[in-house]
């Protein structure tokens, strides 16, 4: 539980609230929307930053033990090249966990990007499956958990 976690596309902090429930405390949030960042509970994250995840992330290489990206890979938001940045800022053997709206998985090229990163041994697949994401709206998402290899 003593690991440094980057919450990419943290929104209002829902992932941070869940992490806190499980005893994690060293996590950092980034989102493009200042309006959403303003709704994050005070002192939940060690640091909150307004960040465009479609551009290089202003973080050092190998800075984080894990990275979460939930609800951000969806229509009109963050594109597949962000996975390279996520991998760059995550340590060797660190974990990257994400969801991808099924409607953009192939259309935006996530399928090819994930396959390429796996084939190039840039990461190792631990879990990857489709699940109900917003069941009430019949929205499904792919859930991925990968271990970074460097």
Short names for language-model regions:
Residues 133-150:
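Core SAM-dependent methyltransferase catalytic element
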Residues 93-101:
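Conserved beta-strand signature within the Rossmann-like core of class I S-adenosyl-L-methionine
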Residues 81-92:
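A short glycine-rich, Lys/Arg-flanked "PGG" loop and its adjoining helix->strand segment in the class I
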Residues 108-129:
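Conserved Class I S-adenosyl-L-methionine
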Residues 6-56:
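Class I SAM-dependent methyltransferase SAM/SAH-binding core
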Residues 69-73, 99:
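Residues lining the SAM
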Residues 1-2:
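Conserved alpha-helix/loop element of class I SAM-dependent methyltransferases that forms part
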Residues 55-67:
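A short acidic, Gly/Pro-enriched loop at the edge of an enzyme's catalytic core
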């Amino acid at each position: 539980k003593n690991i440094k976690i980057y919450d990419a596309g943290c929104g209002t902090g829902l992932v941070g609230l869940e992490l806190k429930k499980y005893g994690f405390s060293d996590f950092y949030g980034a989102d493009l929307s200042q309006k959403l960042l303003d709704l994050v509970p005070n002192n939940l994250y060690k640091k909150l930053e307004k960040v465009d995840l479609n551009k290089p992330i202003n973080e050092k290489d190998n800075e984080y033990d894990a990275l979460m990206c939930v609800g951000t890979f969806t229509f009109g938001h963050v594109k597949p090249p962000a996975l390279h940045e996520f991998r760059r800022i995550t340590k060797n053997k660190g974990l990257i966990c994400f969801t991808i709206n099924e409607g953009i998985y192939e259309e935006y090229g996530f399928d090819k990007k994930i396959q390429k990163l796996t084939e190039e041994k840039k990461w190792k697949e631990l879990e990857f499956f489709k699940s109900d994401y917003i069941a009430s709206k019949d929205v499904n998402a792919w859930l991925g958990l990968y271990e970074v290899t460097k």
